[in-house]
A protein has these predicted regions:
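Alpha-helix-loop-beta-strand connector modules within alpha/beta enzyme cores
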Residues: 15-26, 81-88
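Metal-cofactor-binding active-site regions of metalloenzymes
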Residues: 20-38
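Flexible loop/turn segments at secondary-structure boundaries
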Residues: 32-37, 68-71, 99-103, 123-124, ...
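Active-site microenvironment of metallo-dependent hydrolases
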Residues: 172-188, 192-317
Length: 317
């Protein structure tokens, strides 16, 4: 399963995201599984991650969720940190509510940012200790309103905009970083500051020295807006070439994927078929509802739906 996992990673990095009208970068997963209690499809240790640091579109180690393992000097976690540091790349944090001496130890280990701040006091403590703050506004968590004081000097030069988890439907309907910029401007933030936090600051943080600004020596990745209030993107330029206009790509890229690698990744669900009948629950008694007794042994529709969801996730695991 480790081999399949690595083949899947290679497919994402080498095949499906190259030569697009979009620059796609990666952070390596630091916690697979997320905790020792998880039953993941694979366990990725430092030795499996190490070769990927040499790839130019791999920028570092993703959110170090096992913050307490880091503070307690777990050898496996520290080895991942050492490998990333030796490669000269970034280590992202994930440490909600970590404070005081434990936060000091976490940052001293080499963790350089955090996206889990839900209030301004937590963000300020982490800023004062040298971390970058990723202001998160996604589907599952929305922290921007609580962190609005960061959208001004002297803090905004160390803060950037991120979504963390955002559902595809929300991306299509509302947008990505552009959505956060619009929301920030509507809340009274200086448009120049909001744009800088969505472009220049993250590029500086991740070491993308020639991206994030309109200036000599920078890659001509540009957008043309109708205005700064609605922040409607009219045109998108990639390396100086017009690639999208009024929300549509002009020349969609043909996806080329190594067929052998594709088969190894997608032909990987080794389990018996799960049927809805296996997951249906039967009532064993009666209960009063709307003035009448329900029938014993009736199938509950909510459990039928749950069964379908469970079957999907069981297959995905």
């Amino acid at each position: 399963e480790i081999l399949r996992c690595l083949v899947g990673s290679e497919m994402c990095i080498r095949d499906s995201t190259r030569d697009l009208a979009l620059s796609v970068y990666f952070m390596l997963p630091s916690c697979v599984p997320a905790t020792g209690l998880d039953e993941s499809g694979a366990v990725l240790e430092a030795e499996q991650l190490r070769p990927y640091y040499q790839l130019p579109r791999v920028l570092g180690l993703a959110e170090l969720m096992n913050s307490y393992g880091t503070v307690r000097a777990d050898e496996k976690i520290l080895q991942k940190i050492c490998d990333c540091t030796a490669a000269g790349k970034r280590i992202d944090g994930h440490a909600p509510f970590l404070s005081g001496e434990e936060l000091n130890a976490y940052i001293a280990a080499g963790v350089q940012s955090d996206h889990e701040c839900s209030d301004i006091h937590e963000a300020m403590e982490k800023l004062r200790r040298g971390q970058y703050i990723m202001v998160r506004e996604g589907t599952a968590a929305q922290n921007m309103d609580s962190l609005l004081p960061l959208f001004q000097e002297p803090y905004c030069s160390r803060c950037m905009l991120v979504t963390d988890d955002k559902h595809p439907g929300d991306l299509l309907q509302g947008g990505h970083i552009d959505y956060i910029i619009r929301k920030a401007i509507a809340a009274g933030v200086d448009p120049v500051v909001a744009v800088r936090m969505g472009t220049l600051v993250p590029c500086q943080y991740f070491g993308l020295a020639h991206s994030g600004a309109v200036a000599p020596g920078y890659t001509a990745d540009l957008i043309v807006l109708s205005d700064l209030e609605q922040f409607t993107v009219e045109q998108v330029y990639k390396k100086g070439k017009l690639v999208a206009q009024q929300g549509r790509m002009l020349h969609p890229a043909a996806l080329t994927v190594d067929k052998a690698r594709f088969a190894r990744v997608f032909d990987s669900f080794n389990m018996d078929e799960v049927t809805p009948e296996q997951l249906q629950l039967k009532q064993t008694g009666t209960r009063q509802q709307s003035g009448r007794n329900e029938t014993k042994g009736a199938n509950l529709p909510c459990f039928k739906a749950l069964g379908r969801c469970s079957a999907f996730w069981a297959a995905a695991a």
